[in-house]
Amino acid sequence: MTIMSSLAGAGRGVVNTIGGAAQGINSVKSSADRNAALVSNTGSTDSIDATRSSISKGDAKSAELDGTANEENGLLRESSMLAGFEDKKEALSNQIVASKIRNSVVQF
């Protein structure tokens, strides 16, 4: 091996090292540029921020209406139950009256 080939081998090693470092720097820069482009191209969140409060208000109103509906359903069930009791009382009263009429007819 001659001095020239040793120098050439050393030169190639230096060039390869410098080239590898340059590629690494370029990869890091490309990645940073890509991330910056992604962030800058996503647009603003103004429209999301604008709708967030109305969605929150809508959710609150919906919860309020659900509570009112539950109360009304409870009152409706209670009214239906009371009406059923009244019907049963009326039917029982009718049976008592009919029984008294039958008993009075039999006695005459």
UniProtKB/Swiss-Prot annotation:
Transmembrane segments: none
Coiled coil: none
CC terms in the record's Gene Ontology section: extracellular region; pilus
Localization annotation: Secreted; Fimbrium
Amino acid composition bias (Polar residues), ranges on this chain: 41-56
Stretch list, region Disordered: 41-73
Keyword Secreted found: yes
Keywords of the record: Fimbrium, Secreted, Virulence
Organism superkingdom: Bacteria
Family: Belongs to the HrpA type 1 family.
Protein function: Major structural protein of the hrp pilus, which is a component of the type III secretion system (T3SS, Hrp secretion system) required for effector protein delivery, parasitism, and pathogenicity. The hrp pilus functions as a conduit for protein delivery into the host cell. Also, affects the expression of T3SS-associated genes. Required for full expression of genes that encode regulatory, secretion, and effector proteins of the T3SS. HrpA-mediated gene regulation apparently is through effect on the mRNA level of HrpR and HrpS.
Protein name: Hrp pili protein HrpA
Organism name: Pseudomonas syringae pv. syringae
Taxonomy of the source species: Bacteria, Pseudomonadati, Pseudomonadota, Gammaproteobacteria, Pseudomonadales
